[in-house]
Amino acid sequence: MHTRAIYPGTFDPVTNGHADLIERAAKLFKHVVIGIALNPSKKPRFTLDERIELLKTVTAHLDNVEVVGFSGLLVDFAKEQQASVLVRGLRAVSDFEYEFQLANMNRRLSPDLESVFLTPAEENSFISSTLVKEVAHHGGDVSQFVHIKVANALMKKEQG
């Protein structure tokens, strides 16, 4: 088990579904880099630094997990990190087509980067950052979907 893997995403915010996949990846690979994407086309609720801190909190118990922000092409970030595996999550069959296209594009850009797909536990399969933000925006309790520190941070954001 000498493989370095990257699990990329926006993580705005990190959910229990993300945490589930991170824990699964940490068992499979020697080192897992959580790559938090800075995507100019998205308007995240949390800054990159806030997302990094929240993910560090959620993954603090995992010795082989590192959290890093990045911008630019994922395949370039993977090369920088000397990663040979790209971890992606599939919540539903509907995710597969898009992920399949991404995997093929990444393979064309970087033939040595292999995509591995993981599925979350059933109780986390419906959770998305978008849904969590929507519930929080309307004053709902999101503590069953995210780490308590993430729930508190979301509540503070919503209160202004």
Swiss-Prot record:
Its EC number is 2.7.7.3. Substrate binds at residues 10, 42, 74, 88. Keywords: ATP-binding, Coenzyme A biosynthesis, Cytoplasm, Magnesium, Nucleotide-binding, Nucleotidyltransferase, Transferase. It is an enzyme of class 2 (transferase). ATP binds at residues 10-11, 18, 89-91, 99, 124-130. Its cofactor is Mg(2+). Pathway: Cofactor biosynthesis; coenzyme A biosynthesis; CoA from (R)-pantothenate: step 4/5. One of its GO terms (biological process) is coenzyme A biosynthetic process. GO terms for cellular component: cytoplasm. GO terms for molecular function: ATP binding; pantetheine-phosphate adenylyltransferase activity. The record marks 18 as: Transition state stabilizer. InterPro entries: Cyt_trans-like (IPR004821), PPAT (IPR001980), Rossmann-like_a/b/a_fold (IPR014729). It catalyses: (R)-4'-phosphopantetheine + ATP + H(+) = 3'-dephospho-CoA + diphosphate. SUPFAM superfamilies: Nucleotidylyl transferase (SSF52374). Its main location: cytoplasm. Homohexamer. Belongs to the bacterial CoaD family. Reversibly transfers an adenylyl group from ATP to 4'-phosphopantetheine, yielding dephospho-CoA (dPCoA) and pyrophosphate. PANTHER family: PHOSPHOPANTETHEINE ADENYLYLTRANSFERASE. This is Phosphopantetheine adenylyltransferase.
